[in-house]
A protein has these predicted regions:
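Residue-level signal for the nucleotide or nucleotide-sugar donor/cofactor binding architecture
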Residues: 8, 12, 73-79, 109, ...
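Alpha-helical membrane-targeting segments
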Residues: 47-74, 126-166
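NAD(P)-dependent short-chain dehydrogenase/reductase
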Residues: 24-73, 78-80, 86-87, 118
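Amphipathic terminal alpha-helices
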Residues: 169-177, 181-220
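Two-component system phosphotransfer/interaction surface
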Residues: 79-82, 86-90, 187-195
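Generic structural signal for alpha-helix termini and adjacent loop/cap motifs
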Residues: 58, 91-94, 196-200
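Mid/C-terminal beta-alpha module of Rossmann-like enzyme folds, strongest
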Residues: 87-155, 171, 191-192, 204-208, ...
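Active-site Tyr-X1-5-Lys
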Residues: 5-32
């Protein structure tokens, strides 16, 4: 068991919920699924949608990153998540009383590979990324957030401290207990996401709650 050390409120709430379940479950068995970032064929992932938006619109910030570009985070296709939940229900009588499992793609795309793949899919070119100091990134995010007439940025100053995080998941428990492993991969699904964007950019932006750039406003 890797020690749990949540560093901001969202994961802290998950750890507190797990502890509450263990304390209050009584004689009822529990299955705790620690799920990676979920996406589908259209995207429907907040961080991925914003990353695609930045590269699609060629924002200068799309070329900058305040962390190790060789690091990455695990994701999980929605269909693989549904499959895992169904397997939990089907095998509930054979699982341990407290079954804790990680669900996600074991080998994450690095930030650098993700950038290059999106650059090639969107513009037919590699998308080189420059690592910038965290303080510079925090200052830029803060200025964008307080400057009148500028849109409130997705990336907030407090997020910068987590840019170096790397999540490669051990899904061996799910394999053993559920006979489950992901059938999809973010690497193979990215072309589908970009195809969905190209088919109807306005609808894609609206579905992901993104502000339309001027060129798309004209197509409304």
């Amino acid at each position: 068991e890797w020690p749990l050390d949540p560093r901001w409120p969202y994961p802290q709430s998950k750890v507190e919920t797990e502890r509450m379940l263990e304390k209050e479950r009584g004689n009822y068995p529990t299955a705790v699924l620690r799920i990676a970032g979920v996406y589908d064929d259209d995207c429907q992932s907040i961080p991925l949608a914003h990353q695609i938006e930045r590269i699609y619109e060629r924002h200068i910030t799309s070329k900058m990153f305040p962390g190790h570009i060789s690091h990455g985070q695990s994701f999980l296709h929605l269909e693989d998540l549904v499959d895992a939940i169904v397997r939990v229900l089907e095998r509930r009588r054979t699982l341990p009383e407290t079954a804790v499992m990680l669900l996600g793609e074991p080998e994450p795309l690095t930030y650098d590979e993700l950038q290059h793949r999106l650059g090639r899919l969107l513009h037919g070119e590699d998308w080189d990324t420059v690592r910038i100091p965290k303080m510079m990134a925090k200052t830029g995010a803060w200025l964008q957030g307080v400057t009148p007439l500028l849109e409130d940025p997705f990336i907030k100053p407090w997020m910068i401290d987590f840019a170096d995080d790397h999540y490669a998941l051990d899904v061996s428990r799910a394999k053993e207990w559920l006979h489950w492993e992901p059938r999809h991969s973010l690497r193979d699904t990215l072309p589908k996401m970009i195809d969905a964007l190209r088919r109807d950019p306005v609808a894609w932006y609206r579905a992901h709650h993104l502000s339309l750039p001027a060129e798309l406003e004209e197509k409304r």
